[in-house]
């Protein structure tokens, strides 16, 4: 997983003003008894926290949330917006793109709006290489802001406990395969288009 995640450094600070912070969609499970933030899955929650962190550094930026609704009545873009507002971001600073079903559609739908702007792209570290390629194919050169790193410290000394089976490692392997297959599909599309 580290080889997938190491393509982009975590975001620190941009020397120029940021026009947009783009937060790619994730998942949520609707439950009216829970606050919006508690309805987000882990990926969405990690992206939400990174959005808040970067917005605190660059309050001049507008935030674009994206993602459709799958089987829920509210899109992931709208649920992220609700969560951001709940955490203090002014509603007028947030734009929702409620219809993209995947990263490729997100890039296609968002790119015309941000053309010629300075943008930050937030998604999970394992997904960032593929996401960047989709936006670059649309003529956008975003600043990567990866979050949700699976591998936190590649330089640490590994004790015997590291080599014991863990369910997290199975999740990591599943995600690594998912992203690797996604990149392969992306590559095939460039050949046949």
What label would you give each PLM region?
Residues 3, 173-193:
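A transmembrane-helix-recognition feature enriched in membrane-embedded lipid enzymes
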Residues 1-170:
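A structural signal for short, hydrophobic/glycine-enriched beta-strand patches
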């Amino acid at each position: 997983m580290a080889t997938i995640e190491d393509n982009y450094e975590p975001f620190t600070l941009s020397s120029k003003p940021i026009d947009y912070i783009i937060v790619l969609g994730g998942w949520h499970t609707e439950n009216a008894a829970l606050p919006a933030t508690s309805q987000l899955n882990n990926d969405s929650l990690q992206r939400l926290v990174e959005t808040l962190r970067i917005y605190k550094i660059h309050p001049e930026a507008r935030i674009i949330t994206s993602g459709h609704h799958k089987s829920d009545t509210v899109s992931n873009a709208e649920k992220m917006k609700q969560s951001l507002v709940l955490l203090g971001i002014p509603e007028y600073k947030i734009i929702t793109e409620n219809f993209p079903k995947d990263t490729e559609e997100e890039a296609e739908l968002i790119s015309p709006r941000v053309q010629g702007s300075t943008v930050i792209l937030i998604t999970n570290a394992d997904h960032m290489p593929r996401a960047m390629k989709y936006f670059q194919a649309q003529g956008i050169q975003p600043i990567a802001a990866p979050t949700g790193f699976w591998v936190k410290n590649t330089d640490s000394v590994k004790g015997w406990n590291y080599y014991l089976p863990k369910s997290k490692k199975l999740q990591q392997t599943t995600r690594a395969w998912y992203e690797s297959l996604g990149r392969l599909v992306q590559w095939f599309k460039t050949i046949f288009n």
